[in-house]
Every structure is written in structure tokens, then in C-alpha cells.
Amino acid sequence: EAPANAVAANDPTAVALKYNADATKSDRLAAARPGLPPAEQHCANCQFHLDDVAGATEEWHGCSLFPGKLINVDGWCASWTLKAG
């Protein structure tokens, strides 16, 4: 179950970035983001992903694009960029 401060599907930023808490339900192929094949792109391997934020759980972490909110580590958005390292 999503925490209270999870990014909502109707959040304006989420809509603009085509965020989906389940990457398999997003159109990763159409976005053509470089770095990894679309099927391997998800929030946990994105440079904007933040591990250490208030309220984070194993499944829900922070994202610098959604301050104060949590994203699903298995999610995806159109700003996905491969994490360095």
C-alpha cells in the first residue's frame, strides 16, 4: 500500500513527467531514454532517486523531482536518467 505522502497519479508534476508507480505500465519505449534498455529503467536506478528521506521504506523512496513526496522504487517517469556509477 502506498504511503500517505506518495506521489499521486494526478499530481501535476507526475502528469507532466508521465510518472507511474509501476514502470511496467509506463511507456518507457516511446520515451527513448538512453542508458539502459527501457525494460530495465526504473526509479531505483535513476540519478534523481533518493534513498535517505523521511518516511522512506523498502518500496518507497524519495526523488529530487518530487520534494517531500515518495516514489515507488519500481516506478518510472520521462525524466529517468541512469544513475552514475
Curated annotation (Swiss-Prot):
Keyword Transport: yes
Superkingdom of the source species: Bacteria
Function noted in UniProt: Specific class of high-redox-potential 4Fe-4S ferredoxins. Functions in anaerobic electron transport in most purple and in some other photosynthetic bacteria and in at least one genus (Paracoccus) of halophilic, denitrifying bacteria.
Gene responsible for this protein: hip
Protein family according to the UniProt entry: Belongs to the high-potential iron-sulfur protein (HiPIP) family.
Gene Ontology molecular function, alphabetical: 4 iron, 4 sulfur cluster binding; electron transfer activity; metal ion binding
Keywords recorded for this protein, A-Z: 4Fe-4S, Electron transport, Iron, Iron-sulfur, Metal-binding, Transport
PROSITE patterns: HIPIP (PS51373)
Organism: Thiocapsa roseopersicina
One GO term of the biological process aspect: aerobic electron transport chain
SUPFAM superfamilies: HIPIP (high potential iron protein) (SSF57652)
The protein's name in its UniProt record: High-potential iron-sulfur protein
Amino acids binding [4Fe-4S] cluster: C43, C46, C63, C77
Description of how the protein assembles with itself and partners: Homodimer.
